[in-house]
Structures are given as C-alpha cells and as structure tokens.
C-alpha cells in the first residue's frame, strides 16, 4: 500500500472557535499551532496546508504561569543602529493590542516559510468576545477540558 499524500484540491477545512479566557498562553498556542498545521488529522501531509481555520476570542484574558506576566520580555529591532526595542508581556496585554501575545506565541510554533505564512492566515484572534465569523458556523473546542494544566489554578 502506497503512502497517502493529501492533494491541495482534496483539503476540507473546518472552522473552530476557542475561548481563551483563563487559559495558559503556551499550552493554548501549542494546540492552535497543531490545528493550523493539520497535525490532528490522519490525512496530515507536511507540504500541504490542510489545517483548520481557528478563531480565538477573549485573547486579552489569557494567563501566564510563574512570573512570566511581569518578567517575560518581547524584543524587536527597528532596523536602525541601536534600535532594539522591548516590552514585557504585561505591557502588551494591558496595551492597545493584547491579542498579539497569543499571535506571536502561535507564530513562533509554526514553521517559518511560505507554507507557515499561509497557515498563519487561517488564524483569527480577537481581544473581546465578539467575532465576525458567525456565517462559517464554527465548532467550539474546549481546550480547558483537554488537560487540567491548560487552565491556571490560583
């Protein structure tokens, strides 16, 4: 029997919605990255974008474990000499675009390159509880029920 290889025309993409309230960032990002790549399917093929479309709501209510909320630092460079910039996770979550923390975590778990960029376009992250994708009839995925460590206990 020959090895199965998914053809791009045969791909069936589902829509999944995840409520990120109270979930641990890294664990949630790992599950989202797996869904975006399609590794949860038996038909996974490394060179084909056969992952699902993922909608994440309440991304501003994700949590970190330990002291990462105040100590984790995100760096970027402007391109100018001496242009290194930094922000803590707390500054980003309390700032204008709190969903970027989760977007960056997922982006860094998806392979870099043309396929990874295409798969990242299937991710939609919203800071609040509202999203404009009701017409797609997304299926809810309860990440908290998958493992008790996915939710931070006080």
UniProtKB/Swiss-Prot annotation:
InterPro entries reported for this sequence: Ribosomal_uL13, Ribosomal_uL13_bac-type, Ribosomal_uL13_sf
Record flagged with keyword Ribosomal protein: yes
UniProtKB keywords: Ribonucleoprotein, Ribosomal protein
CDD domains in the cross-refs: Ribosomal_L13
A GO term for molecular function: mRNA binding
One GO cellular component term: cytosolic large ribosomal subunit
UniProt cross-references to Pfam families, sorted A to Z: Ribosomal_L13
Transmembrane segments: none
Superkingdom of source: Bacteria
GO BP annotations, alphabetical order: negative regulation of translation; translation
NCBIfam families: rplM_bact
PANTHER family named among the record's database cross-references: LARGE RIBOSOMAL SUBUNIT PROTEIN UL13M (PTHR11545:SF2), RIBOSOMAL PROTEIN L13 (PTHR11545)
Family classification: Belongs to the universal ribosomal protein uL13 family.
Protein task: This protein is one of the early assembly proteins of the 50S ribosomal subunit, although it is not seen to bind rRNA by itself. It is important during the early stages of 50S assembly.
Subunit composition and interactions: Part of the 50S ribosomal subunit.
Name recorded for this polypeptide: Large ribosomal subunit protein uL13
Organism in which the protein naturally occurs: Rhizobium etli (strain ATCC 51251 / DSM 11541 / JCM 21823 / NBRC 15573 / CFN 42)
Lineage of the organism: Bacteria, Pseudomonadati, Pseudomonadota, Alphaproteobacteria, Hyphomicrobiales
């Amino acid at each position: 029997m020959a090895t199965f290889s998914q053809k791009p025309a045969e791909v069936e993409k589902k829509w999944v919605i995840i409520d990120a309230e109270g979930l641990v960032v890294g664990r949630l990002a790992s599950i989202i990255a797996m869904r975006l790549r399609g590794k949860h399917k038996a038909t996974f093929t490394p060179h084909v974008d056969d992952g699902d479309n993922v909608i994440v709501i309440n991304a501003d209510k994700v949590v970190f474990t330990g002291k990462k909320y105040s100590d984790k630092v995100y760096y970027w460079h402007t391109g100018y000499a001496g242009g290194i910039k930094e922000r803590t996770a707390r500054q980003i979550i309390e700032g204008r675009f709190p969903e970027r923390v989760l977007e960056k975590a997922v982006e860094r778990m998806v392979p870099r390159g043309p396929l990874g960029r295409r798969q990242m376009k299937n991710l939609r992250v919203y800071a609040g509880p509202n999203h404009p994708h009701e017409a797609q009839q997304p299926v809810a995925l309860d990440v908290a029920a998958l493992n008790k460590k996915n939710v931070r206990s006080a």
